[in-house]
Amino acid sequence: MKRDLIGPVKALIKINNCSCLSRCQISRLPHFFTFHPHFSTLIYYYNLKNCITSET
């Protein structure tokens, strides 16, 4: 089930122009994601692998 959601989450992050989780507003994502048990895990996993931290 976790793998099934990674695609949609990636797409949503791109749509919302969120390069890093810290810049993402959860309220901008579809409501059901906030209640999904793996939501934070998926977002964290996605950003861990793909987020380029260029914050100074």
Curated annotation (Swiss-Prot):
It comes from the Eukaryota. This is Putative uncharacterized protein YHR050W-A. It comes from Saccharomyces cerevisiae (strain ATCC 204508 / S288c) (Baker's yeast). The lineage of its organism: Eukaryota, Fungi, Dikarya, Ascomycota, Saccharomycotina.
